[in-house]
Amino acid sequence: MNETIVVLLSIPGLRRQDVARMPRLAALARGGDQAALAPSFPAVTCPVQMNMTTGKLPREHGVVANGFYWRDRGEVEMWTAWNDVVQAPQIWDVLARERPGTTSAAWFGLLSKGCGADYVCTPAPIHNPDGSESLWCYTKPPELYGELRDTFDHFPLHHFWGPLANIASSEWIAASAVHAARTM
């Protein structure tokens, strides 16, 4: 049986000319197809990721920012909302409908908590009552993060964005994705 593998990578700031200096990514690109992305406005993480996973623009999928204002609670929620805020089918939803039996994964896409992908991993730190933070990831199935943590230690959230951002988070994401793909 011929197996088709589709990998959609979201690498902010990556330019086509940068790929040549990245041997593994260049090899992956040579083995498949590439498509240019024309970002929409606003060109921020959540709307652009939803553009990529739905094939729709913000006016159609409903995600117009990285945060959401919940009128009923009078609260702003940044980067942590669940997938039910997305108002258009995503690629894993279409695959499940059009190609039953296809396995899909959403790896470190924001707003992926509760999405229709078969496997999911995304940061979901636990904010404790004392103001401290416990490292954690939302995963589907729920026990997957325990396995990833046991294999790779906790996801290095503090190296994902902000002043301590560095390659450690990208290495964890790549290693965990490869591990999951090989063992799922």
Task: Identify the residue ranges that each predicted region occupies.
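A short catalytic or substrate-binding loop motif that flags glycine-/basic-rich loops and adjacent residues
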Residues: M1, V44, S170-W172
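Residue-level preference for short coil/turn positions at secondary-structure junctions
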Residues: M1-E3, R30, P100
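Beta-strand elements within well-structured catalytic alpha/beta cores of enzymes
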Residues: E3-Q17, L28, M52, L95, ...
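Glycine-/proline-rich flexible loop or hinge segments
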Residues: V6-I11, R30-A35, T45-V48, G67-T80
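Generic recognition of stable, solvent-exposed alpha-helical segments in well-folded globular domains
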Residues: L9, A20-P23, Q90, W172
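An acidic- and aromatic-residue-enriched active-site/binding cleft used to recognize and process polar
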Residues: G13-L14, P39, G109-S112
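Short, structured active-site-proximal loop/turn typified by the sulfatase FGly-forming signature C/S-X-P-X-R
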Residues: Q17-E60, T103-A105
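His/Asp/Glu-rich, glycine-adjacent segments
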Residues: K56-M184
